[in-house]
A protein has these predicted regions:
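Beta-loop-alpha module in the N-terminal Rossmann-like domain of NAD(P)-dependent dehydrogenases
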Residues: 86-149
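Bacterial N-terminal signal peptides that target proteins for export
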Residues: 7-20
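N-terminal Rossmann-like dinucleotide-binding module
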Residues: 32-85
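A contiguous active-site-proximal alpha/beta segment in oxidoreductase catalytic domains
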Residues: 137-185
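Bacterial N-terminal signal peptides
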Residues: 19-29
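Short, well-ordered coil/turn segments that N-cap beta-strands
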Residues: 64, 89, 128, 155-156
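Hydrophobic residues in well-ordered beta-strands that form the structural core
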Residues: 44, 132, 157-159
Length: 185
């Protein structure tokens, strides 16, 4: 049996994953923008998680503008910069500096789970929406603090779950929003 059908299926799944991550992650955040066609100003906090390729390796669709990439590791940022052809001016080694200079509307956290709280602590007071990889936090204490910050500063705090990529999730989203399956939202 050749590996071609499996490879083709994996490529389709990867493509679906990338699309659905953005549909589900930024649907709400995008709806609060005054101009629905305006791309979201997106920054990345942390680069050690493998899902970073869903952002940096994704073909441009005009739905977001990558305005900054942060990680404390200079080796990792150099490798990622070279691999994805990132402009050096969007690379930062200080999260607060990046947030203040590039003013993203949303941040995706692709670093250590131990850094999720730090990212929310930096973003929430600035009114920046955050998506973290699963799990949300390393402890209930961190999770509660993140929830408090999100509520206090009225930001969206999302966790990226693999079910986001399931075809049934995309169909459900279509049924809810395009077909009015549950009424007007």
């Amino acid at each position: 049996m050749s590996g071609k059908p499996a490879k083709k299926t994996n490529m389709k799944i990867q493509s679906l994953k990338m699309t659905l991550v953005f549909v589900l992650t930024f649907f709400i955040a995008n709806s609060v923008l005054s101009d629905e066609n305006k791309p979201i100003r997106l920054a990345v906090a942390g680069m050690s998680h493998g899902h970073i390729s869903f952002i940096l390796g994704r073909p441009a669709k005009g739905d977001f503008e990558l305005v900054g990439v942060f990680d404390t590791s200079r080796v990792l940022t150099q490798n990622v910069k070279v691999r994805y052809g990132l402009a050096p001016e969007i690379i930062y080694h200080n999260l607060e500096k990046m947030l203040d200079e590039v003013k993203p509307e949303a941040v995706v956290a692709f670093g250590s789970i131990f850094d999720h709280l730090m990212v929310v602590e930096a973003c929430a007071p600035r009114g920046i929406h955050v998506m973290v990889e699963k799990p949300l936090a390393v402890s209930m204490e961190h999770a509660k603090r993140m929830a408090e910050l999100a509520e206090k500063h009225q930001i969206f705090l999302l966790t990226d779950y693999e079910t986001s990529w399931y075809p049934t999730t995309a169909q459900s989203l279509k049924m809810v929003h395009k077909d009015g399956f549950v009424g007007k939202l």
